[in-house]
């Protein structure tokens, strides 16, 4: 078996004045070799011109550190709901997602993660059809190499994308197969009811491969969960402090079928001495060492 190629990073900020260049610097400070960004605030449509993003500087810094641009991820804004019951909302979502895909491509990134949406008062089948119809319209409108990665969801409210059947329905009906993929989120999977112990996750991947195809998995979000399995809550926890557990997460991260696939941390920041600090540097070290330690305790007692 080939040596495992661990591609590990986290969500990082993208803000003035350094923009994308600053995002890369932040990722490097955590010891990461990938990253995920939003191209603007995830809760609104306001966006800075992409020309301000210092893209060349970011690309040069990535090259200096031998980081493959193809492993970087953009996350689409939360406000995009492809299966809204309101047509004008779906039209706005489509136009905004087209802009986000084009911004992703301009940055040289090839993957954008998308929440499939919430069907609200609609029938599930109608909602699923609206998602793949929108994606087909988008890929018929623009020529892009960007892959839209449907994120597995927790089942909070009326979210879709919570099981293989729903994901399969969308993917089967997207015409441009090169532009569609899946992002597995471990917190969302557990909160939706999927068991993530060693044997259960092996079985899940077998079922995924049989129903959809393992090659559609393009990225993983690695998060522990504050909730019991099946809670449908979506509350992320730091690695080893939640109900999934560090050993189960390490098994997922280093699973041989998931080699060469980017893994992205979205774990909470830690409230420490009247400030909030990132634990990504420590969590990435734990992942590389495959050994957990109680970083919150060590920070609190002043022993790093």
From Swiss-Prot:
Amino acids binding Zn(2+) 2: 151, 185, 221, 266
Signal sequence, renumbered to the chain: none
Classification via Gene3D superfamilies: Divalent-metal-dependent TIM barrel enzymes
Protein name: Probable endonuclease 4
Cofactor (UniProt): Zn(2+)
Organism of origin: Ureaplasma urealyticum serovar 10 (strain ATCC 33699 / Western)
SMART domains, A to Z: AP2Ec
Catalytic activity: Endonucleolytic cleavage to 5'-phosphooligonucleotide end-products
Keywords in alphabetical order: DNA damage, DNA repair, Endonuclease, Hydrolase, Metal-binding, Nuclease, Zinc
A matching Pfam family: AP_endonuc_2
Residues that hold Zn(2+) 1 according to the record: 75, 115, 151
Annotated gene: nfo
Record's cofactor remark: Binds 3 Zn(2+) ions.
InterPro entries found in the cross-reference section: AP_endonuc_2 (IPR001719), AP_endonuc_F2_Zn_BS (IPR018246), Xyl_isomerase-like_sf (IPR036237), Xyl_isomerase-like_TIM-brl (IPR013022)
């Amino acid at each position: 078996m080939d040596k495992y190629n661990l591609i590990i990073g986290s969500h990082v900020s993208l803000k003035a004045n350094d923009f994308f260049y600053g995002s890369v610097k932040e990722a490097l400070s955590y010891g990461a070799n990938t990253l995920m960004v939003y191209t603007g605030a995830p809760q609104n449509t306001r966006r800075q011109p992409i020309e301000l993003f210092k893209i060349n500087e970011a690309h040069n810094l990535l090259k200096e550190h031998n980081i493959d641009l193809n492993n970087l991820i953009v996350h689409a804004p939360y406000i995009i709901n492809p299966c809204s019951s309101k047509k004008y909302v779906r039209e706005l979502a489509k136009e905004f997602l087209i802009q986000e895909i084009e911004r992703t491509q301009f940055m040289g990134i090839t993957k954008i993660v998308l929440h499939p949406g919430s069907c609200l008062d609609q029938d599930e089948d109608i909602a699923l059809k609206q998602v793949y119809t929108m994606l087909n319209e988008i890929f018929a409108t623009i020529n892009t190499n960007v892959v839209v990665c449907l994120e597995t969801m927790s089942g909070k409210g009326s979210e879709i994308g919570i099981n293989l059947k729903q994901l399969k329905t969308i993917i089967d009906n997207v015409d441009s197969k090169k532009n569609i993929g899946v992002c597995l989120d471990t917190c969302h999977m557990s909160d939706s009811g999927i068991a993530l112990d060693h044997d259960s996750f092996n079985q899940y991947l077998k079922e995924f491969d049989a129903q959809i195809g393992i090659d559609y998995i393009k990225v993983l979000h690695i998060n522990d969960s504050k909730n019991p399995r099946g809670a449908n809550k979506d509350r992320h926890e730091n690695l080893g402090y939640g109900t999934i557990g560090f050993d189960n997460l390490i098994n997922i991260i280093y699973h041989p079928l998931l080699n060469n696939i980017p893994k992205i941390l979205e774990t909470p920041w830690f409230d420490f001495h009247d400030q909030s600090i990132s634990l990504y540097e420590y969590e990435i070290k734990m992942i590389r060492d495959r050994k957990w330690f109680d970083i919150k305790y060590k920070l609190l007692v002043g022993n790093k």
